[in-house]
């Protein structure tokens, strides 16, 4: 894979670069495009009802001057894909990997990862889009500040881990990429797909040889809510931190992991920048969706 950077002079420009790539991917798999100033947006997933009301989405729609005509929430992919009212759909956990096989047209990023986080609908039908790969790449490149990490460690095995792995391979094709998760079977699938080393949490210190990764990424849901932090974290977090290294937590909430990383002297980014980039992609897709 050839190196492709999104990094620009500042954060807003980097987000715009991610949006351009996301739009271009959709146009590469469908002929013809149009524009729309209004949208009915659907959502599916554990936090979809909250996301549909969220400020980050509404800020992005306002920036693109898209009028939100309504929102609809569904409990499963069958209900979502069987409803004709919506023009754009947010696909959140745990459905990102389950929805992809049900959509005949996928963007290259969605096809490479098997992950769909957004569906855009036009006259030619529905297209499954992976905005998260572009958004996470924008976030990680911003956090690295133009430097190339010596190693990247991704914690987790769900849909987001696949998106982040693809983003790493686009930004830094030759980087040492490592994955660790309790679900070793799911972990092995994305590790093989993106030429990464992998192991369970217990073997991680040995694999790293006690050399913390330059860029540490948490794609797990630990830290997403107060309740999630009630259980012990699966990893020895202190052994993964090092002063001056980078920690990217996909969770928007300021979690205990982020606090620990800051106390260890790391450069820390929450998931908010990534979510702003994701929603910027979604709003732009709604504005310029296929007809």
Predicted regions and their residues:
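Conserved S-adenosyl-L-methionine
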Residues: 170-176, 264-267
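Adenosine-phosphate binding glycine-rich loop
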Residues: 2-26, 64, 243-291
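Phosphate/diphosphate ligand-binding glycine-rich loop within oxidoreductases
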Residues: 1-144, 254
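Glycine-rich adenosine-cofactor-binding loop
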Residues: 45, 130-133, 140, 144, ...
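Conserved hydrophobic helix-helix packing surfaces used for dimerization/oligomerization
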Residues: 17, 38-42, 152, 177, ...
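Short, conserved loop/helix-junction motifs that constitute active-site signature segments
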Residues: 32-35, 145-148, 169-173, 209, ...
């Amino acid at each position: 894979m050839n190196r492709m950077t999104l990094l620009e002079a500042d954060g807003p420009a980097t987000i715009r670069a991610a949006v351009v790539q996301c739009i271009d991917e959709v146009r590469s798999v469908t002929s013809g495009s149009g524009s729309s100033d209004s949208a009915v947006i659907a959502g599916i997933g554990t936090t979809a009802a909250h996301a549909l009301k969220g400020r980050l989405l509404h800020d992005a729609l306002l920036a693109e001057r898209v009028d939100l005509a309504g929102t609809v929430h569904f409990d499963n992919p069958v209900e979502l894909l069987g409803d004709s009212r919506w023009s754009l759909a947010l696909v959140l956990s745990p459905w990102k990997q389950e929805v992809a096989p049900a959509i005949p047209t996928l963007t290259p990023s969605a096809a490479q990862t098997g992950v769909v986080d957004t569906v855009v609908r036009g006259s030619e039908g529905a297209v499954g889009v992976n905005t998260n790969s572009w958004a996470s790449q924008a976030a990680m490149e911003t956090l690295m500040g133009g430097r190339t990490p010596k190693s990247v460690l991704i914690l987790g095995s769900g849909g987001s881990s696949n998106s982040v792995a693809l983003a790493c391979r686009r930004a830094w094709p030759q980087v040492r990429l490592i994955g660790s998760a309790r679900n070793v079977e799911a972990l092995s699938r994305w590790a093989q797909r993106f030429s990464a080393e992998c192991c369970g949490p217990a073997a991680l210190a040995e694999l790293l040889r006690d050399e913390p990764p330059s860029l540490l990424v948490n794609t797990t849901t630990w830290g997403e809510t107060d309740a999630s932090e009630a259980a012990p974290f699966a990893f020895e977090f202190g052994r993964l931190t090092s002063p001056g290294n980078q920690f990217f937590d996909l969770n928007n909430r300021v979690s205990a992991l982020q606090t620990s990383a800051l106390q260890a002297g790391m450069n820390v980014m929450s998931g908010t920048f990534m979510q702003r980039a994701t929603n910027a992609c979604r709003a732009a897709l709604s504005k310029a969706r296929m007809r």
